[in-house]
Amino acid sequence: METKKIFVINGGQVFGHSGGRFNKTIFDTTRQFFNGKEGFEIRSTDINDEYDPKHEVENYVWADIVIYHTPIWWFQVPNGLKKYIDVVFTEGHQTGIYHSDGRSSQNPTVNYGTGGMLHGKQYMVTSSWNAPKEAFSLPGEFFNETSVDDGALFGFHRMNAFTGMKPLPGLHFHDVEKNANIVVDLERYTTHLNNIFINKEHEHLSNSNFQSQATAH
């Protein structure tokens, strides 16, 4: 059996009134899911802990699949996760994450975003929101019927595409402050992990429709 190498990143920053507990729970669930499972090796990083940028680059290069767990603060990832990406990806310039922006001075108008060094790898992202899922889907509601992946996480997805990685279907947790149900969320997430990594349902999804199916959860 081919071994899949999984690198898990907890972006649930402890800051202000946020204790980061929800994403830490999801992060721990991911590690527990893969630990001891035949066919998987796992490494993990919590952005709240000290990290060595060179070692983090090695983790990206080592991994077949990167899993990000992040809350959304003010419609963006937390500043601690953004700093982690800035520091680690800068360290990874020409050392494993990206070589260049892909363009040449001879023809600078084309091929932007094709200089990544992580081709052949995949990533998955989960996000947690105070906003209910209806805020994204109902006419007249706040997000103008724009999904998480096509809206707030659009830049995050393009960031990973810049490195050469391809997406796996993710999962988004809504209304986690005023209407949380952690038992249901964990059951739904474990089912998602089984579907993606054990049953491999994603292999039957086309690249054109994976995000719509992922955000429907």
Feature-to-residue mapping (PLM):
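Helix-loop-strand module that forms the ligand-binding subsite of alpha/beta enzymes
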Residues: D52-F156
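Short loop/turn segments at strand-loop or loop-helix junctions that form parts
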Residues: V8-G12, S127-A131, L171-H174
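Short, flexible coil/linker segments at domain boundaries that flank nucleotide/cofactor-interacting
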Residues: M1-E2, L118
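N-terminal beta1-alpha1 ligand-phosphate binding loop
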Residues: E2-E38, H202
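Glycine-rich phosphate/pyrophosphate-binding loop and the adjoining helix
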Residues: E2, N23, F142-H217
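A short beta-strand-loop structural module common to alpha/beta enzyme folds
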Residues: K37-Y51, L171-H174
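Residues at alpha-helix caps and immediate loop-helix transition turns in enzyme cores, especially N-
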Residues: G19-N23, H55, V77-L81, N181, ...
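A structural motif corresponding to the C-terminal end of an alpha-helix
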Residues: F33-F40, G115, K121, M159-L168
